[in-house]
Amino acid sequence: MTRSSPKSILRRVAAHEGAPKILQVLKEDGAVIIRGFLNQNLFQKLNKEMEDELAKRPLICEHNGEWVSGLAGSQTRRLNQLPAFSPTFRQEILNHPLFHEICEPLFGTHGCDYWMNTATVVQIGPGNAAQSLHRDQELYPVFNPIGKDAPEALVNFFCALSTFTDENGATRVIPGSHQWDDFTTDVTRCVPQTIPAEMEAGDCLLFSGKTVHGGGANRSKDNVRRGMALGVQATYLTAEENYQHIPREIVESMTPLAQKMIHWRSSYCPGGAGLWQINGTELANEIGLKANQPKKTI
């Protein structure tokens, strides 16, 4: 297998430098750290809203199998369905201006719309082994034979909600691996080529679905590492996480854009027909969905 030499650094771009610069580094390296993607008030509110729900989650993944446990982690708590219980997530994260300034050209270049694949809070505790290296785009095997020439169908905004260090399990990335020639071979032994994405709370590691990465081992004695993985994908793909069960009252408190992000509105690709419709028309109109409504309870 022919591989380009991995890049020796993981580049950083400040949020205020804007989407064009962030996208340029992402295109070249397959990964970029956005400094200050979430302001302090935002990530503190997220942490507060998620604390009780996260504490209820078990440490051990409910699925069996060595492959799954290697991805899920034995000392890891995972929290999904964030729009259901976090007002900050559904009102601020899903409407984050820079988030959409990045996604619109990234997916629009390939003539498609975008929405959420999944959103997960990942908390890694001391003693957790390193996650198996993988590419997120492997979720859709059709892309593997196409490799580096496949369209950008999935990206991940992995936001630090606490400090990420090499010792406490910072995500490890291989910059440049999105340009390797062969995506069908085993990458689990490429650990020596990885770089830890060390970040302060509020920073964000943005990486392509084609980029090899994996959570690092938490070698600390008492340091818990918490992050929020926000996967975004082309709307022509089935999402990993389903949000149809979220109470309608909650959904109707959201903006139309946020509703689309959780699959409660139809998607429209430039030059193509709509997706996720009812009777060939907008889903929200057919079901009488309102938006921006006051909500009586959280």
From Swiss-Prot:
GO MF terms held by the record: dioxygenase activity; metal ion binding
Enzyme Commission no: 1.14.11.-
One GO-annotated biological process of the protein: biosynthetic process
Cofactors named for this entry: Fe cation
Residues that bind Fe cation: H134, D136, H213
Enzyme class: oxidoreductase
Disruption phenotype: Abolishes the production of aculenes A and C, and accumulates aculenes B and D, as well as a minor component, asperaculane B.
Swiss-Prot/TrEMBL catalytic activity: aculene D + 2-oxoglutarate + O2 = aculene C + succinate + CO2 + H2O; aculene B + 2-oxoglutarate + O2 = aculene A + succinate + CO2 + H2O
SUPFAM superfamilies noted in UniProt: Clavaminate synthase-like (SSF51197)
Oligomer status and interactors: Homodimer.
Job of this protein: Dioxygenase; part of the gene cluster that mediates the biosynthesis of aculenes, a unique type of norsesquiterpenes that contain a nordaucane skeleton linked to an L-proline moiety and are of mixed biosynthetic origin. The pathway begins with the synthesis of dauca-4,7-diene by the terpene cyclase aneC using farnesyl pyrophosphate (FPP) as substrate.
Protein name (database record): Dioxygenase aneA
Species of provenance: Aspergillus aculeatus (strain ATCC 16872 / CBS 172.66 / WB 5094)
